[in-house]
Amino acid sequence: MSQNQASSPADAKPATAISRIAALIPGILLCIAVAGVSALLERAELGVFEHPYVEALVMAILLGMALRSFWKPAPRWQAGIAFSAKQLLEVAVMLLGASISFAAIAASGIALLASIAAVVVIALCVSFGLSRLLGLSTRLSILIACGNSICGNSAIAAVAPIIGANNDEIASSISFTAILGVMMVLGLPLLIPLLQLSATQYGILAGLTVYAVPQVLAATVPAGLVSTQIGTLVKLMRVLMLGPVVVGLSLVASRWQSDAKKTNVGFFRLVPWFILGFLALATLRSLEIVPSTVVGPVTKITSFLTVVSMAALGLGVDVRVLANVGGRVTAAVTLSLMLLLGISIALVHWFK
């Protein structure tokens, strides 16, 4: 057999995997570098002011956005940046489960569960109504309502095939989400002293208003571990509302979507892998299979991954995108989010 014979498909698979991993390295290293500078600046603040007024997590977003505003990363950087912004942050969310006991849910009681469901339903109705009043199509209004009220782009991706939304409607509904998501992560902690919120209250507020589970983690880190735990639990409960919403929309859409193909939404579209991992680790922690000595190291790893991911998030946000977003879509998304924030602020004062 000739030594020059072409390699078999089996030999090609490892090479393909290695090349994919290699493609991630430049972008990941860039995000780590931005995160490292952010950590150094936080230490400098601590040395000068004796308090980090702008924490590394927020600094990483701001530095990433500043860098992105005058330098568009070349394609060789993009894969690693995207991986850091999504997968690394999802891993951080999953690991957070190791520090949470389901006793926190039991302590909150049925009132919190009912309140979360009520907020989601009210937000869905108000967001849809506002979007329609602003002249947006029914499908686009549904996408905006689900994205704002449940879990951002994940909800939009799950609902879009159910209602037969086209690419333009999907793009319009998600184009403003990245920027608003960053604004919420940066701005929400400012409400802690302004509204004199406790750690529990702020966690509930973040869980009710921030778009995605990973972003809740980022928004609550400045308020401490208790706030992060509560916020993540509230957000997970909110995400679970996606199932009933999709079922309801499927029943409604089947009546006026006769010309479109019926699409089944898979289980992992409704419940992402990192949420399942979070719940699994939380279960193990509640059963004390995961010992308390693990919580400290896991929390440090989670914090590191979160800062790296926030650097990636900043690097992926181009504020100039605002110029390309339609005025009515921008108004609908912004007003809906403000109303959701107002409802949530009123609610959290019930919980101490």
From Swiss-Prot:
Instruction: Tell where it localizes.
Output: Cell membrane
Q: Which InterPro entries does the UniProt record give? A: UPF0324_pro (IPR018383)
Regions crossing the membrane: 21-43, 53-71, 88-110, 114-136, 143-165, 175-197, 204-226, 236-253, 265-284, 294-316, 329-351
Q: How does it sit in the membrane?
A: Multi-pass membrane protein
Q: What is the protein's name according to its record? A: UPF0324 membrane protein blr3189
* GO CC term (a single one): plasma membrane
- UniProtKB keywords: Cell membrane, Membrane, Transmembrane, Transmembrane helix
What family is this? Belongs to the UPF0324 family.
